[in-house]
């Protein structure tokens, strides 16, 4: 499993991500994203974007780090997105109980392979990635533990370790560029 995470840990993370509070900023207003629901405000704000993603650089590999280290990683992610010519907006994710919160970036119109590569490069197991006009989807960079099979809003992405090449499986057509398994 990526990042050395056990199936039990992946299941815990998935449950946490599915219930988290996601927000993105536009015109000074923080707007909500909910996994499994469409994002019409986002679609309206960026009508030309075919898809959207949300990611952080905090706590790579799910290893808790000091705030100063997470902020440094966040700046590195911003620099990388600038180099790649990506458009992005401030965002965050928080536990419903507010016991944790992470700075995130809403990425506008990311290419699927580039987005997955950023997630891997910054040690992120879970991101959000979905096509415009469709419900927000959780994208896990791991094999699906048995406890997580069946959620229709989770994509499980597995990359070939030896080559770094990803193979398509089943996901929305414009997001199926990695070996992606949707929960049945």
Where are the regions a protein language model picked out?
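Short His-Asn-centered micro-motif
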Residues: 55-56, 108-110, 130
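Short, surface-exposed beta-strand/loop "edge" segments at domain boundaries and coil↔beta transitions
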Residues: 61-66, 113-116, 137
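Short cationic amphipathic helices and targeting signals
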Residues: 99-109
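Helix-rich interaction surfaces within compact, conserved domain-sized segments
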Residues: 114-133, 139, 156-165
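A cross-kingdom feature marking charged/low-complexity
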Residues: 140-184
């Amino acid at each position: 499993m990526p990042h050395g995470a056990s199936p039990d840990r992946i299941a815990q993370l998935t449950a946490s991500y599915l219930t988290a509070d996601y927000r993105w900023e536009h015109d000074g207003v923080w707007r909500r994203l909910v996994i499994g629901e469409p994002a019409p405000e986002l679609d309206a704000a960026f009508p030309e974007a075919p898809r959207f993603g949300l990611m952080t650089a905090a706590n790579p590999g799910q290893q808790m780090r000091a705030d100063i280290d997470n902020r440094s990683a966040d700046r590195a992610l911003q620099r990388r997105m600038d180099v790649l010519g990506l458009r992005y907006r401030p965002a965050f994710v928080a536990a419903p109980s507010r016991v944790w919160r992470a700075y995130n970036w809403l990425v506008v119109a990311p290419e699927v392979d580039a987005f997955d590569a950023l997630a891997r490069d910054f040690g992120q197991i879970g991101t959000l990635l979905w096509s415009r006009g469709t419900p927000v989807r959780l994208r896990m960079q791991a094999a699906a533990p048995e406890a997580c099979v069946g959620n229709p809003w989770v994509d499980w992405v597995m990359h070939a370790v030896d080559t770094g090449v990803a193979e398509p499986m089943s996901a929305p057509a414009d997001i199926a560029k990695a070996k992606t398994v949707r929960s049945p």
